[in-house]
Swiss-Prot record:
GO terms for molecular function: DNA binding; zinc ion binding. GO terms for biological process: segmentation. Residues 177-196 have a biased composition (Basic and acidic residues). It is found in: Nucleus. The gene is hb. This is Protein hunchback. It comes from Drosophila adunca (Fruit fly).
Length: 196
């Protein structure tokens, strides 16, 4: 559900943006010709500057809205599927981290699936990650930067701190068993510090 909503939102945004733009343009044209035809030439300067400013206002509001939406998406991305996103984004990007992150991830599926709702299972989230890559590069770049930062943090703090809501159960489950993976992880992120 989450990933499909996410993909739908992302796909709709550019379309609705274009549509909105055209729509505003049309109404502004119609308004222009109407005002010129029906109103006296005296008044036509008033309505004709009016629609553009109105359009600009609409567009500004819409852009602000879009920015907020994108920020929300970023927050959602970073809060909810952070761990899946971590695995998805780190595995292709950092060859040095490849095996380590895979090993670390393979140690986690059970606790993750227990804690995450069904829609947060690796496969849908992976699709959400790919949609993000395709549709809005900025968000993904920001997420990747955040991931790098998180990776550096993981050298100092265990990954559970990234997702507070899941931390208690996860820290018990994952720390009890795949501690080797955590050591690998912190080593590799220290390597990354020197690489980056």
């Amino acid at each position: 559900w989450y990933s499909s909503m996410f993909a739908a939102n992302i796909k709709q945004e550019p379309i609705s943006h274009h549509h909105h733009h055209h729509h505003a343009h049309h109404s502004h044209h119609a308004h222009d010709s109407n005002s010129n035809a029906s109103n006296s030439p005296h008044q036509s300067p008033l309505p004709s500057p009016n629609p553009p400013s109105h359009t600009n206002l609409q567009l500004e509001q819409y852009l602000k809205q879009q920015q907020q939406q994108q920020q929300q998406h970023q927050h959602q991305q970073q809060q909810q599927p952070m761990d899946t996103l971590c695995a998805a984004a780190m595995t292709p990007s950092f060859s040095n981290n490849d095996q380590n992150s895979r090993g670390w991830w393979s140690g986690l599926p059970n606790p993750m699936q227990t804690i995450m709702p069904a829609n947060m299972r690796p496969s849908p989230t992976a699709t959400a990650a790919t949609t993000a890559t395709d549709c809005c590069a900025p968000t993904t770049t920001a997420a990747a930067i955040a991931l790098q930062a998180n990776d550096k943090l993981q050298a100092l703090t265990p990954p559970m701190d990234v997702t507070p809501p899941k931390s208690p159960a996860k820290s018990q489950q994952s720390c009890a068993e795949p501690e080797k993976e955590h050591d690998l992880m912190s080593n590799s992120s220290e390597d990354m510090k020197y690489m980056a």
